[in-house]
Amino acid sequence: GTKIIRSAHEMNGPIDDIPGRLAKMRITGFEIPKIACMPRNLTDVTRMFQQAATLEPGQQILCAMGPLGLPSRILADKINSYLTFVSPPSAEKLKSIGHIDPLTMNKIYDFRAIDKNTDIYGIIGYPLEATESPTIHNGGYRNHGMNACYIPIRCETVDEAMNFAKITGIKGLSVTVPHKESILPHLVEKSPE
């Protein structure tokens, strides 16, 4: 039968109990509940990933909005989301709320190939607006036939990035400004080079 998308948008922060809110949105059984929220920090995005891990795949749509929420759009499969939302390349103003265009999603991040077995890597920094690292790394992964994806992870602190990496199973991180020195206590091995 036909299903409808029943949406809940929270523009002022995260939704604390995502599974509970989804359950309340399932009224007739013909809904695909959608939750979109505006995270205040990467910790809010991490909580979404944690809660999403308890959900049945493909039975809901989840999205953290804004630049902080970009990982939830790219890694929709990893948060058991039925789909993700993109915008036309001409919609520049939508980038401020974390929208990404479908060409970038597929050409840079190889979105359609991301699955539960995809190894995730990333770059952490703030504000992380002009990095070419995903283009370079994801191109290399494709050239070597690797099931891997490299994503930008906008974070104000190294601690929240390390927690996000732990919760999401990220295999490795590159570090850029302003975290190049604050990452040092988290390193297992250091050298003068």
What is the predicted function of each stretch?
Residues 2-117:
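Catalytic alpha/beta core domains of metabolic enzymes, predominantly
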Residues 118-193:
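Phosphate/diphosphate ligand-binding glycine-rich loop within oxidoreductases
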